[in-house]
């Protein structure tokens, strides 16, 4: 304790306590890299240990403070200490703290020589503008590139790191190979917490905030500068609105920001952060703090030992896991001590208390069984938490030793991923885990690492058989291989020497894992082949593989490549290569299928000496993407490990053979021709060909000591309730069943699944209500009586429990496992459970608990499909298969979990089958699948050609076709319906011994049997003997009956009557149901009307209707038959990935990888992809043709949707994603080699990131998006070929680019590609488009004449008739447009359907600005800040007219300023973009959007110009002699950009259309418009001036604008303000000036529009005629005709022109 003041002084100089700022988000990134001695407050992790907020700390420190801290450091004189003795004599946490202090002081001594270095870096001025920040920081970054790459993308160095950081970085290049591991600056750090018991008031010394001085002053100064820069940038990026209470007040935004380093920032005190509460107890008062850590308890004893709460006062204490510290530093704390220390995260305490109280309340009322179950779960969890305190392996160490003489170690903890690694104090780790340290240094110094020049890779040696087990196999424990395993090892070695890759296909339980590891060990020791060996295994067996490698081949370095992106990056940093030699560190890499596919590019880049695939039957489909990915890996030898090499067809066997030996088994057609069915002696030749490549042994042949396995099939009848439900399901689905072979497969399968559920238990069909039973006994009885199987199982388990047997119970259905678990709890039978939801360590705990010596667990509930192979439950001697699987192989695997090596008792297998049900028939048919397995693999027969089918498996889930399914469904149904409704008989009571005696029994006798007996014995289900033979003979007769004969007519009539009643109810209750449907729509359900429609029109509808009691049962899935083989979750994943790629139907392999659907065949994926695409197109078309609801705002419209199976798809969203990524898909080469050379063809603007970012990085980012999908930033980061690993997603969240910045950059780059593509296509198509244009003229001209005649002849309809006529004409126009556009465009454009039915391009961007653009706009609009503020807030007391005039003046002032701002640009694209940005900025100050404001401004400016130029227009009646300067300027503007003009009329690609329309505002007029290109002098007076070309161009202008005029028109009238009307010209006599078409140079390039309307759509507007009448100029002056009609809203025109004869045309949306 007396060293406390010393500690404080050291803390003052080191800034060490700053680690508690982890929760600020900088934990992983801003810590320094390699401080071996930074544990001044008792910490043990010193290299990336300190973790401070980089901005607040450095910005707050002045130069004088830095100098003071340096002086303090100079004064510290460390004593000499023997570190090892020091630890032995003082093993408490205080001693650890002191050792760290001494170590720190020694480091300070070494740094004195560097103190005089230059301070110029820190004096550098840090500008507040973002540009100067970036440019200067880039210079700094270049100086320190070496440090940057070591940080793994974590950003700039942090000032809170250790003193030895820079020195260590300099030493990196010179340190030897064993010390080449450097500490990361971006990972979770863990240190021993400070001695919290010493902190009385929780206040930390402010001096702790002083930053440490690195050995290099330049580094220190750079840190200062970087952090100041970040600080000022954070200030600059605040989104400040101009809306203030005092309009003209000078606010903070008007002031320039000063340099960050001149602005002192308040110091923040930093405290520890609670990560989670692990446990709670009542403990002795004061038994809290650092003395309660596990190492302090081991050293000094437990302060809580011997506490009895009844005899002495106690207090509630909580076990705390501290953020940034490993579990080894967990401490017990009270609420009081936590408050004293001012820790962060106290809200978690309240949550923990609330949860704890709820648990205690539940336990108080729970039954003893529930309490016991809860306690067991807690015990498992506690065991798991204890593992978190055990070091699994050390992966790095610091290069500098502490005062105690130990380096710090980077530790990976058991049961936790690599991302949870932490730096720990060397003295502590060496005391507790010295073995891990020895292994670590042994691995680092090992000479047995892989090297490319190993000669046996090029020339295989001669095979020498192993007569006895070599000494190197068996590990330290001296384990022995069995004889057949040694033979297997010899066979594997022989195959390798011969150059044959092979398949190890031993039956489950024979030790394929051990044989494989022994083979790798053989290569390692006999042939000095040190790897790299890749083992791809399922997740469920990965820990088993890891354990066996450690046991049998401990000399080999095996790395488990698993976890999230951070974990895998950690492995690649520390476990992959030696930093000096770049040679691989590991011999064996263990990974899973999923991780292999995620990191395909990285792992596929290595040359593997060996690839082994466990559970290789996942490769049986050669069309799956998993298969295609793995087969491309470079390997010298391949081994497939599978217990079931053949499941359904010979094609699957060929797929495996093709994978291992693609040259030898190259063609399936040749293989089928040689060994296919009908070929005499075909199988003999096949056996001979397979011999060198496939080894298959079964237990009874090789393991004579394995006890017998006896199977009994127990048949039982259904309970009365089951019979009722069974008949009810069949009756309800009568319509679907009666279709027979014309029905849908999915429909039959759904019925089948419902019947299988019914056979298992009634609760699967209709669960009971919560309060249905009064007591536990009644609930138990009802549970048992609801299933015939459970009645029998109950008797069986009671008998087995008496005998002392231990039981495995398998079911396919997880909900059935729930019911069985409930039953076992009622019976108080202790059990474990394993299904798909129980993962990783919990699964391992359950297995170990069951297999433990003296375990009291009686049952183990397992899902048939869960767990994979390799799970050993040999301590059980009884297997109950509650329901048989479609695939008999799964049941065999289930049995083998008990009947395997190590089993000492006879294994009894009881298969429960419901008599007279679909189950019985399924079982009979499924056994035929086993015959194939025997004929080919077991080599038992060579004449079974009639049985073998060589085609592909019909389905992975069910092997039956429609005819078989229909026959199975009829099985037993007739007998069932013979019992009258409501009089179903309960099954007869029978003694369990009698049942077992009568059951058919099959034993696997060791002697050879006949072929048929052997087949059935292997399958364990013999043909149904004795009492059931009659049933099988009756099957053909039963199958011939129709469902009308099976289901009684009265029951069918009753069902029809119920349906009629339901329909009538729906008709009468329609309004209420419509409301109801709205209320529940958020659940994704549908109204009952749609349900009844589907019920009558679809096969599978009727199925789902018939099985929905109490909203249970399978969901309604209408088109499920179209997507066979995909679950809803898989479809969701597919659609999510589908949206990430352009041209998704050409990128199915990438989609499958991203969606983790690599097991699916490309054919299935293509089918699903086409279903999605076509469904979206259809939904959009249906939506555009149907009437949408009016009213409501655009932003709220979700767009058309449709359903695929149970998944709702937003058609608009999917198509928009697809279209937006098309430019990327077209630009990036599909060939991988060409893709590597790709460079973006456009000039790109600078990216203001915190790292150097150039054109090459932009190109790599686009390549990454192409390969991995839009948004897959982590995958892009991990691809070494893209060189973005250290550039994107830095670990410091304050550093850019993070995901948000990458998305913005990607959008910008794709937009550039779109424009570039559009230009190229425009140039390439210019010639042909001119020819087409000439033909189009004539048609459009003819149409114009027709329209003119119609206008003349039409009389004005009554106002009341107007809307109907308008609608008719509108619909006619729209339909014409749709028909023509199909012909003129490459493909249909994706559209958003507005309420009025007019399509608007789907790719219109939302009006949002990124932060940087917003800031620029803000600065540019600062001169009109007052006008912006007043825009929406006119003075009080003004009349309506005055208010409107006020608003108009503000708008004119703002608009004129924008026009001035745009003059600095010459590029039309830039002008368009910045006009858009500035108007969007203006829109933030008013309720109008940017388009509306721009349009209103143009109206206002037009009015101003008209009033000024009215006299000029009257004096110049002839338009051809006008010399208005505006018109002259217009002609100049329109006389250039020929390529743009040519492309105007050409057939352009869809994407260009989208690109332009995304960016433009609705009200914009068009720059360099082609319609204004013709010289006015070409017109003659009178009607002759209207030549066809003139109309063609003008009408295109108007018809194209038609699409975009709809946005404003469909809004409700109250949405418009009077502002719009007042700002427009209401007088028809006003003359339009020539400058109307050119408002402030606001013209779009002629390439803006690419879609052409048909000639029927080109109608001139009545405005032209009205202007002609009102004007004193010549008849139909071209200038008058060319007024921008688009500037008037349709609403205004309908009001203005009602009195005119042609007002019908005025209302047409143009």
Swiss-Prot record:
GO BP terms: chromatin remodeling; nucleosome organization; positive regulation by host of viral transcription
Residue positions, PTM Phosphoserine: 215-216, 241, 252, 471, 1025, 1040, 1081, 1085, 1096, 1098, 1100, 1102, 1161, 1353, 1355-1356, 1360, 1363, 1371, 1373, 1622, 1677, 1689
Organs and tissues of expression: Expressed in many tissues including in the brain, where the highest level of expression is found in the cerebellum and basal ganglia.
InterPro entries linked to this entry: CDH1_2_SANT_HL1, CHD1-2/Hrp3_HTH, CHD1-like_C, Chromo-like_dom_sf, Chromo/chromo_shadow_dom, Chromo_domain, Chromodomain_CS, Helicase_ATP-bd
Chain spans, region Disordered: 1-252, 1080-1120, 1321-1408, 1502-1710
Keyword annotations: ATP-binding, Chromatin regulator, Cytoplasm, Disease variant, DNA-binding, Hydrolase, Intellectual disability, Nucleotide-binding, Nucleus, Phosphoprotein, Repeat, Transcription, Transcription regulation
Entry keyword annotation includes Transcription regulation: yes
Sequence repeats (start-end): 1628-1632, 1634-1638, 1640-1644
Domain of life the protein comes from: Eukaryota
3 X 5 AA repeats of H-S-D-H-R: annotated segments: 1628-1644
Stretch list, region CHD1 helical C-terminal domain (CHCT): 1409-1511
A GO term, aspect molecular function: DNA binding
CDD domains: CD1_tandem_CHD1-2_like (cd18666), CD2_tandem_CHD1-2_like (cd18661), SF2_C_SNF (cd18793)
Amino acids binding ATP: 506-513
Domain Helicase ATP-binding positions: 493-663
One Pfam family recorded for the sequence: SNF2-rel_dom
Enzyme class: hydrolase
A single Gene Ontology CC term: nucleoplasm
Location of the Chromo domain: 272-364, 389-452
Record's catalysed reaction(s): ATP + H2O = ADP + phosphate + H(+)
Regions of compositional bias (Basic residues) in chain numbering: 187-210, 1108-1117, 1329-1345
Domain notes per entry: The 2 chromodomains are involved in the binding to the histone H3 methyllysine at position 4 (H3K4me3). The CHD1 helical C-terminal domain (CHCT) binds DNA and nucleosomes.
Description of how the protein assembles with itself and partners: Component of the SAGA complex. Interacts with BCLAF1, NCoR, SRP20 and SAFB. Specifically interacts with methylated H3K4me2 and H3K4me3. Interacts with the FACT complex, the PAF complex and the U2 snRNP. Interacts directly with PAF1, SFA3A1, SFA3A2, SFA3A3, SNF2 and SSRP1.
Disease: Pilarowski-Bjornsson syndrome: An autosomal dominant disorder characterized by developmental delay, speech apraxia, intellectual disability, autism, and facial dysmorphic features. Some patients may have seizures.
Family: Belongs to the SNF2/RAD54 helicase family.
Designated name of the protein: Chromodomain-helicase-DNA-binding protein 1
Organism of derivation: Homo sapiens (Human)
Lineage, highest ranks first: Eukaryota, Metazoa, Chordata, Craniata, Vertebrata
Gene designation: CHD1
